[in-house]
Curated annotation (Swiss-Prot):
Keywords: Amino-acid biosynthesis, Cobalt, Diaminopimelate biosynthesis, Hydrolase, Lysine biosynthesis, Metal-binding, Zinc. The lineage of its organism: Bacteria, Pseudomonadati, Pseudomonadota, Alphaproteobacteria, Rickettsiales. GO terms for biological process: diaminopimelate biosynthetic process; L-arginine biosynthetic process; lysine biosynthetic process via diaminopimelate. The gene is dapE. GO terms for molecular function: acetylornithine deacetylase activity; cobalt ion binding; succinyl-diaminopimelate desuccinylase activity; zinc ion binding. This is Succinyl-diaminopimelate desuccinylase. Signal peptide: none annotated. It comes from the Bacteria.
Amino acid sequence: MKIDPVELTRKLISFESITPEDSGAIEYIATIFKKSGFDCEILEFGDKVKNLYAKYINGVPNLCFAGHVDVVPPGQLKDWAFGPFKPEVRDGMLYGRGAADMKSGVAAFIAAMVNLIAEKFQFNGSISALITSAEESMEEYGTKAVLEWMKNKQKKIDFCVVGEPTSSEKLGDTIKIGRRGSVTFELICHGKQGHVAYPDLADNPIYKVISILSKVKNTTFDHGNKYFQPSHCEVTTIDVGNNTSNLIPGSATTRFNIRYNNEQTPGGLYKLIDEICSSVTNDYKLSMHSSRDVFLSTPDRNTDIMLDAISKVTNIDAILSTSGGTSDAAFIKDVCPVIEFGIINKTAHQINECVSVNDIHKLTAIYKEFIENYFNPTNKILNQVNVVSNISSGPLLA
């Protein structure tokens, strides 16, 4: 059985899998894998959040592809040129929610694996897929939970490719070898409620929040390094729960997010922020939520194999990057080396999200080339001086 990755992308888009629902997509994918001889485990965690781990042949090394089928809400349906879950192709572009992030990536690596098996590809080892419906939200019941299940079952992955949309301008221009970590702080500053005409009888907490945020924003956390941009902070909310104009509020709440590199740790950042807060006021409450840790997969032979596959299919020399948001690769890095590579991300999460049909076919070809050379490296790969070591002293990363 061979698969057309574009048709599979269309089918996956048709599932209204708004996070963390899969709306049948996980079962559908499992059916495809089973027809090609994969052993499939559909795993439910939390409130019936579905995940899939599919594996072909029980050998080593185990090359895994990972991704998600859940999507963010489509927003106002009237703003879409086509129904977000009714995929349409116009002028070579496939439209639909999840087209970029990341149902085309999932379809491409499924097609690459299944089609190689149909072509009687000979290799020593295993190929597998880890697919979740809880990446955009409730991540504790998605990839993270599957990896814990695998650990308990003594199921090992040796290398993983996450099919997130990493390309910026052209398919093949960017591989992610790491991601910054993300921590969100909530700060509540207390004061004393009162009438605006009698400020001497009140204590306005808004000024405390403003002072603290100014200090945080002007803090140089670090200067970045060879692999990462400097850590930075962005304020996301300020709320006093007050819709009147003559009342000094009794408390003020703010939230801010820090995207941090491998020069920092969540604990170290908490200590720093706490010191800033205490320099302004003693009447505050500070809490922190760490969603995903920073990670870096040191470039190696497998990175070279992906660079070579991209170059062969697209004639583009990809850059290695750690920019952008977080992903489930931050969980996978705890069990094996991981890189991310996929389609162009320009329209991810946007109205009229779309990808090039031609790029879906090219992405599938790149994944196939990578799988073939991962298991059966060409003489070029075997004899190649590590590509990364030759360029790391130059402009390696974006």
